[in-house]
C-alpha cells in the first residue's frame, strides 16, 4: 500500500504561521503511514505539489485577507496539473477571539474558486496571536496539533 502524502505550505511574516504549520505537521506526522512535506510558499516550486494527496495552506491575516504571498501561490497552483484531491487551510490573526477568522474564510473561498477539483476536507483553523507580531495566544498551538491529527484521520478513511 502506498502511503498518503501531505504537503503543509505556509506564509509567515513574524513566524507565528510557521509555528502553527509546524504543529499541524506534527499532528499529521504522528499518524503512521502518512508522508509529509513542509515549506514556505515563496520557496516552493508549485510543480512539487502536484503529486501530493492533500495540501494544507496557511497564511497570516493581512487587513482581513490572506497574505499576498499565499494568494500568488494559489494563483500559481491553478496553472499546475494537480493530482491532489484534498485541501485544508489555516491562518493566524490578531484581535478578538472568533471561531473562524475572515481571512481563513476568504482563503477557503479562493481555493474553492481557483482549485475547484480539490475537496475541502475540513473547515479552516484560525490561530489567534497577541498583537500583530505575536506570540501565539496560550492554548492555540494544541489546536494546531489537533487540526493536523483530524486531517490525517480523515485522509486515512478516504
Language model region names:
Residues 2-4, 16-19, 27-31, 37-41, ...:
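FMN-binding flavodoxin-like domain, especially the glycine-rich phosphate-binding loop
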Amino acid at each position: 500500500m502506498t502511503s498518503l502524502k501531505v504537503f503543509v505550505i505556509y506564509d509567515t511574516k513574524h513566524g507565528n504561521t510557521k509555528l502553527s504549520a509546524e504543529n499541524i505537521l506534527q499532528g499529521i506526522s504522528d499518524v503512521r503511514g502518512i508522508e509529509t512535506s513542509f515549506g514556505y510558499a515563496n520557496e516552493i516550486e508549485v510543480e512539487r505539489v502536484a503529486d501530493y494527496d492533500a495540501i494544507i495552506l496557511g497564511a497570516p491575516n493581512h487587513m482581513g485577507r490572506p497574505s499576498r504571498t499565499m494568494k500568488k501561490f494559489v494563483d500559481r497552483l491553478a496553472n499546475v496539473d494537480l493530482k491532489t484531491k484534498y485541501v485544508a487551510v489555516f491562518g493566524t490573526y490578531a484581535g478578538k477571539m472568533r471561531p473562524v477568522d475572515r481571512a481563513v474564510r476568504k482563503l477557503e473561498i479562493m481555493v474553492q474558486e481557483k482549485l475547484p477539483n480539490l475537496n475541502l476536507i475540513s473547515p479552516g483553523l484560525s490561530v489567534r496571536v497577541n498583537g500583530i507580531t505575536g506570540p501565539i495566544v496560550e492554548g492555540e498551538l494544541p489546536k494546531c496539533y489537533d487540526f493536523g491529527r483530524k486531517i490525517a484521520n480523515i485522509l486515512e478513511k478516504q
